Amino acid sequence: MTTIVLNPNEPVEVALRRFRRSIERTGLIKELRARTSYEKPTTERKRKKAAAVARLRKQVRRSMPPKKKY
């Protein structure tokens, strides 16, 4: 459960922003959206595999030296 302590003389908007940020850090919103509808295990594996491949490609691209522009 995510909780925040409201500081004295703190505007509600600032406290709400801190609360939203803390929820995003915990991954609660992402998990909630994932659980709104059922995803078949094969579809879930396929999605996770595609994400892993994309991460790997991005990592390889970043590790390569930049192309020469001449």
UniProtKB/Swiss-Prot annotation:
Residues covered by region (Disordered): 37-70
Gene3D superfamilies, A to Z: Ribosomal protein S8
Biased composition (Basic residues): 45-70
UniProt record, GO biological process: translation
Residue stretches in coiled coil: none
InterPro entries registered for this protein in UniProt: Ribosomal_bS21, Ribosomal_bS21_sf
Keyword Ribonucleoprotein annotated: yes
UniProt keyword Ribosomal protein present: yes
GO MF annotation, one: structural constituent of ribosome
Pfam families noted in UniProt: Ribosomal_S21
A GO-annotated cellular component: ribonucleoprotein complex
Keywords: Ribonucleoprotein, Ribosomal protein
Family: Belongs to the bacterial ribosomal protein bS21 family.
UniProt protein name: Small ribosomal subunit protein bS21C
The organism of origin for this protein: Burkholderia mallei (strain ATCC 23344)
Taxonomic path: Bacteria, Pseudomonadati, Pseudomonadota, Betaproteobacteria, Burkholderiales
